[in-house]
Each structure stands twice: as C-alpha cells, then as structure tokens.
C-alpha cells in the first residue's frame, strides 16, 4: 500500500509538473503570437530596400515613460549594391519626418502610405561606396501593436519596445530585413533623470543634462536584425554581475519589487547554471564581449532582444527559452518567417536541455518527453515550415505543436 501511494503521488507530481511546464510554454507562445498578429500585413522582404546594405545606425531619441511620444533622429550608414538615385527606409506614417540631412544639406523625401520613407539624392550614388544620412522625426507611434508602449509598473511609469517581427518601423526608420543585419548600432536615449534606460550591448555612458534629464548611451558591435533592437525605461534596480567561464558581464535591470522577491532573485541567479549548460552544448555565448542580461517589462512572456532579453517574469523555463534564443534567433537568424521553427524549435530544445540537466530527475524527464511526443503526434501531418500561403495565419506560424514542440 505504501509503495502504491508513493507511485500515485509521483504520477500526480509529474502531471502537475507537466501542467506547469505546459502553462509556461503557452505563455511564451501567446506572447510571440500576439506580437506577430498585429503586423501580419507586412511581407518578409521590402523589395525597395534590397539595393543597399545597412551597415550602421545611431538613434538619438528623446522619450518620457509617462508620455506616448518619441522625437529625435536616426543616422544610417549604408553601401549601395548598385547605382541609386533614391533610398527607402521602413517607417510608419504615424511618425512625421521633418528633415533628411545629407552631408550638411537637406534632401527631398516622401512619406509613403506603404510604411516607407523615400529619400531622393541630388545625384546618383555609386555602387559599393559607404555613405550616410540622418532622418529627423517625431510623433506618437502606431497604437495597439506593442512595438512602442508606455504603461505603469507598481505605480511607476515604464516605456518599452517589442519589435518582433515588423515593429521596428513603428518607432525608428530602419531596414526590416532578416538577411541584412546592422553591423553596429549606437543607441542614445534622453529621458527624465530619475529613470534608468536598458538596451542592447555595452553601456558606454550616462550623462546628466540640464532640466533633470539624463542621456544614456548603449553600443552593440555585433550584427543585429532590426527587430532585436530594444529599449526599456523605468525606475530599474541595476544589478551588475558576471556569468560564464571565463566570466563576462551579467546585467539585470529589474523592478525594485523584483529585487525584493527571493524566488525571482534565485531564478535570476540560476541563469548562470543555464548559461554554463548552454555553453557546454551550444558553444561559447555569442555576445561575450558585451553582456547577457534581462530588462523587465510589462508584458507576459519574454522577448530575446540581443544581449538583453525583455522579461515579463522569471520562471526557469522562460529564462532558458530566451537565453537559448541568443544562439538560435539572434546569432543565427531565420532568413524568412517561413522558417521561424529554427528560432522557436531550438529555443524549445534549450528548455528540454535544462529540464534534463538541471531541473528534472531522469524519470520526470522521460515522462516529460513522452508528453511532448504525444502532443506532437496528437494530430496527423503538419510541417515545421510555414508555406507562403499560410504567412497570414498567426496560428500556423506560432503553432505550439509544430514550430515549438516538433521543432524542438
């Protein structure tokens, strides 16, 4: 009888554990699905941006987490791959361009209803020659897409961005191509001095300005797809630590309430174990010269912004999923959204890996895998590749059975 009770309790534990894991996975999927669904009217590639290579961008923006507005400029360095007399950038019309500067002069431009800015040069630019221009703009970004959001956390204002897949154009002019990563990105944000600004790469400086403002300068020198650029701003507690072997910076910008939560802090510390495991099996963390870390934001789930994941919470599964994306999704990025299983499948595999090595017993893990297999085979057919005809179906792209479970 005693053994029977223990066996039944074990089954109950495994079932409960599996339900928790399933709930966590569904939260991750719903986050990514909701981010994508608002922007499905855009295709994989804007053909008007294929005639140049975007090499560098510098954003100089002024924002306030209490105000739904952005103003400033973005400087872009590019190399035409053919002679061009005009250049296009992705930018939604809710943002108003006031000027395009080019070597001290102003250029003519048009804002098009196709979410583009067309800039006309006074003379054709030659192929294979580095050039640059600056777009000055301002406005209230498109509402409802979560690409640019202001809200509150614990009664304090917070601003965050979440650009996957096509939301970068909602808050800055860029080239939204998965095949043309931006080699270097400088992110300069002016905001009220009481807030801390989190972003990609290395923190270069924080400078107090007149009028109780602060300029925060982040720089990343690793190639990055436009949708992986992000900022988040609130009264963060900043935690500077190290991770990995040999160690590199582990930087967390979290709410003060999270810093006072022992369970959340223990899981953030657990990230170090996940990093060691992933480096053992995936190879060196791909952005070691800068950092890894988390910036907390007001949405459920998370987002694998390069070098600094945005996190709605700190469960171990979510931490592992977003960390695995740094290898698969950020360093190695699918060339088209048809192949999103390459991002999500490998991130799901990362969850499996920490379940096996760090979280579960052998029995728990085998039962977990059986559950995954049963889920994958619960319906007939299904390809991890999303055909062009299904790119308008967010439920097909973010299919938990195929893109996540079967992909993993």
Model-found features: residue ranges?
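A surface-exposed beta-strand-loop module
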Residues: 20-21, 28, 87, 92-154
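Zinc-dependent metallopeptidase catalytic helix centered on the HExxH motif
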Residues: 308-370
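Glycine/proline-rich low-complexity spacer/linker segments in large multi-domain proteins
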Residues: 47, 136-185
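N-terminal, polar/Ser/Thr-rich
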Residues: 18-71, 153, 157-160
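Bacterial Sec-dependent N-terminal signal peptides
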Residues: 1-26
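Ligand-binding face of N-terminal immunoglobulin V-set domains in extracellular IgSF glycoproteins
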Residues: 67-93
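Acidic/His/Gly-enriched intrinsically disordered linker/tail segments
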Residues: 344, 348-408
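Hydrophobic helix-coil surface modules that form long, contiguous segments used
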Residues: 72, 163-164, 176-320, 349
């Amino acid at each position: 009888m005693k053994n029977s009770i223990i066996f039944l309790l074990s089954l109950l534990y495994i079932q409960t554990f599996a339900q928790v894991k399933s709930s966590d996975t569904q939260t991750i999927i719903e986050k990514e699905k909701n981010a994508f669904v608002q922007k499905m009217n855009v295709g994989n590639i804007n053909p008007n941006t294929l005639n140049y290579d975007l090499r560098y961008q510098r954003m100089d923006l002024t924002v306030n987490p209490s105000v739904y507005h952005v103003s400033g400029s973005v400087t872009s360095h590019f190399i035409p791959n053919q002679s061009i007399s005009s250049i296009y950038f992705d930018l939604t019309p809710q943002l108003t361009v006031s000027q395009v500067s080019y070597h001290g002069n102003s250029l003519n431009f048009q804002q098009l209803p196709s979410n583009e800015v067309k800039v006309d040069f006074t003379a054709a630019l030659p192929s294979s020659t580095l050039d640059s221009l600056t777009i000055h703009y301002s406005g209230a970004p498109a509402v409802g897409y979560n690409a640019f959001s202001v809200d509150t956390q614990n009664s304090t204002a917070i601003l965050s961005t979440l650009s996957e897949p096509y939301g970068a154009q909602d808050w800055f002019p860029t080239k939204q191509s998965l095949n043309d990563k931006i080699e270097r990105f400088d992110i300069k944000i002016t905001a009220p001095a009481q807030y801390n600004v989190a972003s990609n790469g290395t923190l270069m400086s924080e400078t107090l300005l007149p009028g109780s403002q602060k300029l925060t300068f982040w720089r990343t020198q690793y190639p990055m797809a436009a949708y992986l650029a992000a900022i988040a701003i609130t009264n963060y507690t900043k935690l500077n630590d190290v991770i990995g072997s040999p160690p590199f910076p582990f930087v967390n910008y979290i709410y003060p309430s999270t810093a006072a939560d022992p369970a959340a802090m223990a899981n953030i510390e657990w990230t170090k174990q996940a990093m060691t495991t992933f480096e053992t099996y995936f190879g060196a963390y791909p952005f070691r010269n800068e950092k890894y870390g988390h910036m907390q934001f007001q949405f459920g789930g998370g987002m694998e912004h390069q070098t600094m994941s945005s996190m709605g919470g700190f469960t171990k599964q979510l931490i592992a999923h977003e960390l695995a994306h740094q290898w698969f999704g950020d360093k190695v990025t699918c060339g088209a959204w048809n192949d999103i299983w390459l991002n999500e499948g490998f991130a799901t595999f990362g969850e499996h890996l920490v379940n096996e090595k760090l979280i579960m017993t052998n029995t728990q893990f085998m039962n977990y895998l059986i559950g995954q297999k049963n889920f994958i085979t619960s319906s007939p057919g299904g390809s991890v590749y999303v055909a062009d005809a299904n790119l308008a179906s967010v439920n097909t792209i973010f299919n938990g059975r195929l893109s996540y479970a079967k992909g993993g």
